[in-house]
Swiss-Prot record:
Record-given protein name: Ubiquitin-ribosomal protein eS31 fusion protein
Residue intervals of the Ubiquitin-like domain: 1-76
UniProt region (Disordered), positions on chain: 76-95
Pfam annotation, one family: ubiquitin
Naturally occurring in which organism (per UniProt): Gallus gallus (Chicken)
Amino acid sequence: MQIFVKTLTGKTITLEVEPSDTIENVKAKIQDKEGIPPDQQRLIFAGKQLEDGRTLSDYNIQKESTLHLVLRLRGGAKKRKKKSYTTPKKNKHKRKKVKLAVLKYYKVDENGKISRLRRECPSEECGAGVFMASHFDRHYCGKCCLTYCFNKPEDK
């Protein structure tokens, strides 16, 4: 029977084969006509790559069927070298977890009266519960950047 082999260049060659012929035999016939070594040939039929040990009848290749010839690609992707950094990686700042942190902001005296130790930010943007940091010369809100400066250090 006669089959067609279409190469990458678009050229179509005809081969005389039998249904019992193996794929290896077909590749050898292509080598005789085109000069491409069988180890570099890949034959595709109906979207499947044909394996060397099987026959044409295994793949249901009938007379006047067209096989597509593509060349086997050499190698794979280039191996990349792992980067080595000269300086060590900077550690991220870890926030310290303080148990019962609310106790820093309030004081309970012997009468049971609660007084604030830190000033609460009056800005509408911050809302209730945002306290200002007390520095030696000012009170500062870290959320809205509001700052109150003292005239004298003993004026706290």
